[in-house]
Amino acid sequence: MDVVDLWVNLVTSEGAREFLGQAQFANIPGYLGSSSTEGIATEGMLALMDELGVATGILCAGMDRTAEHALAVADEHPGRFLVALGLADSERPTRNVRRIRKLAEHTATSMVRVMPLNNQVAIDDARHYPVYSVCEELGIPVGINVGIPGPRVRSRVQHPELLEGVLIDFPDLVVIGAHMGHPYEELLMNYMRKWPNLYLSCTAYAPQYLDPGLVQFMNSKTYRGRVLWGSDEPWFPMRRSLTEARALPLDDDAMALFLGGTARRLLDRSAR
């Protein structure tokens, strides 16, 4: 079975401590039940992926020089990594568009991530619209964090209701809701029924706690393949996430789509 982890992070131990040392993220270790202070390097990530049977990881990078570093890692390990560009600065939309166009020349650039909790700029803010527009034009999916986040920040900026305007204004844009969207799963299922280009992922969320109605949705003949698996390693351990994901009561076809089939179709530009 082709397994694709939608969200992995390469981070040094120093970087992990610095990240978790920020006031808004200080509760993350307890919230996820993992210290995550040791970080993980490329070889450690590959060893973990090999052990667990994960073929490809979607590597989270910034729009700065970390993007080139991540793409170099993808080049060094063909087929093992694709790269997601995390939008950190929403204040300079034109620069972001130029960066996306440049980085999209590399086929390992698989998606752009909008994470409203980080900069407190809402999903439907006008500053994000140029990013959505260029991604729609280039056929690159956008991942958008939705729901109440673990960090102690205002969550209204990523309420799933804010997706509606984006989906209306960019009908050909593929949007993947990130980090589960809890406690708004029912709303997100209704949106997915309505919008064929909307997907959801369980990144940074324990699969054993998936809403039973969502699991039924994932198993249905009509909507299977609309929810994607991902861990957020090392912040949420890949081992725990994948073990719990494989234990869900999904039939073989639904499980294959959940664990990697849909991600491969949407994100692997070399396979199109």
Task: Locate the predicted segments by residue.
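Active-site gating/metal-coordination segments in enzymes
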Residues: 55-56, 64-157, 194
